[in-house]
From Swiss-Prot:
<keyword id="KW-0472">Membrane</keyword>
<feature type="transmembrane region" description="Helical">
    <location>
        <begin position="242"/>
        <end position="262"/>
    </location>
</feature>
<comment type="similarity">
    <text>Belongs to the monovalent cation:proton antiporter 1 (CPA1) transporter (TC 2.A.36) family. NhaP2 subfamily.</text>
</comment>
<feature type="domain" description="RCK C-terminal">
    <location>
        <begin position="405"/>
        <end position="486"/>
    </location>
</feature>
<dbReference type="InterPro" id="IPR006153">
    <property type="entry name" value="Cation/H_exchanger_TM"/>
</dbReference>
<feature type="transmembrane region" description="Helical">
    <location>
        <begin position="173"/>
        <end position="193"/>
    </location>
</feature>
<keyword id="KW-0630">Potassium</keyword>
<keyword id="KW-0406">Ion transport</keyword>
<keyword id="KW-1133">Transmembrane helix</keyword>
<dbReference type="GO" id="GO:0006884">
    <property type="term" value="P:cell volume homeostasis"/>
</dbReference>
<dbReference type="Pfam" id="PF03471">
    <property type="entry name" value="CorC_HlyC"/>
</dbReference>
<dbReference type="InterPro" id="IPR038770">
    <property type="entry name" value="Na+/solute_symporter_sf"/>
</dbReference>
<comment type="function">
    <text>K(+)/H(+) antiporter that extrudes potassium in exchange for external protons and maintains the internal concentration of potassium under toxic levels.</text>
</comment>
<dbReference type="InterPro" id="IPR036721">
    <property type="entry name" value="RCK_C_sf"/>
</dbReference>
<keyword id="KW-0812">Transmembrane</keyword>
<feature type="transmembrane region" description="Helical">
    <location>
        <begin position="196"/>
        <end position="216"/>
    </location>
</feature>
<keyword id="KW-0813">Transport</keyword>
Length: 574
């Protein structure tokens, strides 16, 4: 490649990236996933589009996609709270294993029938599109206030279901490439355990070593993110090299670092946020360039049947069967999880495997995977907000600071500065600072008024429009935000949680005459907390609901995992 070609490559690449970024606001206006915008830009720049760029280098696309996916999973892991595993780990693992196997089987049967394939070829198609995509799930769920059980299950599933899909894809390719090969059940079981076992061991072990290395190193602030990124990629590559799941490993590395007091954590997250956007843009641009839309015309009708068969039948059946042991999931939760079986980059990456193995019909597998991904993003991704509202799994928005940044005084400092803009409807307007009930371990460090810095004292009175810089830790964030942040619209909370709020220590006997409850010997001595535990189990989350004696009971308050109050919706309002 000469200098002119290199400059042309830089010019075209930068232009496509800039166009993708500038078009990103269109996604929110049209209600479509931003990843679809990036993919569309790549397709339009490709062979059949106005750009006319001929790109058919599957090896390069495979390299770019794997690198991008690793970075996205590292960032996603660092932003996942390990506390969410309390309610979502086992359901997510069930979906990531049994769910993928069931989806693969049903989709494989449909593919074999629709495209007149051998049943093994049909199963290969099912395995390729059988797993949800972490990049798509993290991107579309980011910033949404979903029921914790549902949101965490979807995120953990998407970060851990790739080993099963890779295992099934590689095994089926080996069988199809050599029909005489003897692949025993024990061999396949060992391969499966190796994928998961090595992925978990190297992810957690490597994450611990990387965490120690980061905290013991004294580097310039900008170098910590590079150390984490390079270390994560080394663990990802080592896991793949040894036969484990690199995708699972790097997700666990991020999870470990994000939930430990890590030096430079806030600057690492800021850098990874930018890197994740670059990765998403680069990955979907390259995959879009790889597609020749005219090739999809021959398969569009059976392709639609396959995509909708998977969305409306295979995925829901897999979810319902996988979650049968977990009674805490309501029917609405299950339907929403079924609908958010988003396909993205992973199926396209897996579809490259048969191409690189030289299997007959590999181009069909690739085109089918791409078609399913397009339909999934366009149909499921675009309707996610509506689905969350209909399933009642999206919680009212919480008050939050307008910005927050780390104060990394110590190597593992957890202090942050939260910035709040006071609105007129806050009760603290006109009150002196000394009368505020601030959470323990927090302090107002600065007050800005009309672009002027004030020196706050106990007698300083707050005014509407003031900007407060508050020093504290994440454990105090909710209390501080309730005190200073712009609250959600007052109608939203009652509409979701109910019009009446009851402390969980109240006895049902005291509520019986008010709400017309009919109690027996078993319920006569119960408190509201006992009722919630009996109906929802030991790990309820905010927004959980159940119907009891014609009333809708909604978990409206939690403190360290314990339900503190419950909202009640009357039958006419439910």
């Amino acid at each position: 490649m000469d200098a002119d070609s290199i400059n042309s490559f830089f010019l075209i690449g930068a232009l496509l990236a800039a166009v993708s970024v500038l078009l990103s606001p269109v996604s929110s206006r049209l209600g479509i996933p931003i990843l679809l915008i990036f993919l569309a830009v790549g397709i339009l720049a490709g062979e059949d589009g106005p750009g006319g760029i001929l790109f058919d280098d599957y090896s390069t696309a495979y390299l770019v996609s794997n690198l991008a996916l690793a970075i996205i999973l590292l960032d996603g892991g660092m932003r996942t709270r390990v506390a969410s595993f309390r309610v979502a780990l086992w359901p997510a693992l069930s979906l990531a294993t049994f769910g993928v196997a069931i989806t693969t089987s049903i989709t494989g049967v449909m593919a074999a029938w629709l495209f007149d394939l051998h049943w093994l070829q049909g199963l290969l198609v099912g395995a390729i599109v059988g797993s949800t995509d972490a990049a798509a799930v993290f991107s579309l769920l980011k910033g949404r206030s979903l029921n914790e059980r549902v949101g965490a299950t979807l995120e953990i599933e998407s970060g851990s279901n790739d080993p099963m899909a890779v295992f099934l894809t590689v095994t089926l390719i080996a069988i199809l490439a050599n029909v005489d090969a003897e692949l025993s059940v024990s061999f396949m079981l060992i391969s499966f355990i190796k994928q998961f076992g090595l992925g978990i061991f190297l992810g957690l072990g490597g994450g611990w070593l990387l965490w120690k290395l980061v905290n013991l190193s004294k580097l310039a602030e900008g170098l910590y993110s590079i150390l984490v990124l390079s270390g994560g990629l080394m663990i990802y590559a080592a896991s793949n090299k040894l036969g484990g799941s690199g995708i699972l490993s790097i997700y666990l590395v991020g999870l470990f670092l994000g939930n430990k007091p890590t030096r430079g954590r806030h600057s690492i997250l800021n850098v990874l946020d930018g890197m994740t956007w670059v990765s998403q843009i680069g990955m979907f641009l390259v995959l879009g360039l790889l597609l020749t839309p005219s090739d999809l015309l021959d398969i569009w009708l059976p392709g639609l049947a396959l995509a909708f068969g998977m969305i409306l039948f295979a995925r829901p059946l897999a979810v319902w069967l996988s979650l049968l042991p977990f009674k805490s999931f309501s029917s609405r939760d299950r339907w929403f999880i079924s609908w958010v079986g988003l396909r993205g980059a992973v199926p396209i990456i897996l579809a490259v495997f048969p191409m690189m193995a030289g299997l007959p019909g590999a181009q069909l597998y690739f085109n089918l995977a791409f078609f399913v991904v397009l339909v999934s993003l366009l149909v499921q991704g675009a309707s996610l907000t509506t689905a969350a509202r209909l399933a009642k799994v999206e919680l009212p928005p919480k008050p939050l600071p307008i910005s927050r940044s780390g104060v990394e005084i110590y190597p593992s400092s957890e202090w942050e500065v939260f910035v709040y803009h006071l609105s007129e409807n806050k009760w603290c307007i006109g009150e002196p600072l000394k009368r505020l009930s601030m959470p323990d371990g927090t302090r107002i460090a600065a007050v800005f008024r009309h672009n002027t810095l004030l020196h706050p004292s106990g007698s300083t009175c707050l005014e509407a429009g003031d900007i407060l810089c508050v020093l504290g830790q994440e454990k105090s964030l909710e209390a501080l935000s309730n005190l200073f942040s712009q609250a959600p619209e007052t109608k939203e909370v009652p509409r979701f949680f109910g019009d009446f709020f009851i402390d969980t220590e109240v006895k049902l006997l005291d509520l019986a005459p008010i709400y017309g409850l009919e109690l027996d010997e078993a319920t006569g001595d119960m408190t509201v907390a006992d009722l919630v535990a009996a109906e929802l189990g030991s790990h309820p989350v905010l927004g959980d609901q159940f119907l009891w004696q014609s009333l809708h009971w909604v978990v409206a308050g939690l403190n360290e995992g314990k339900v503190t109050n419950v909202g009640i919706r009357l039958p006419a309002e439910a």
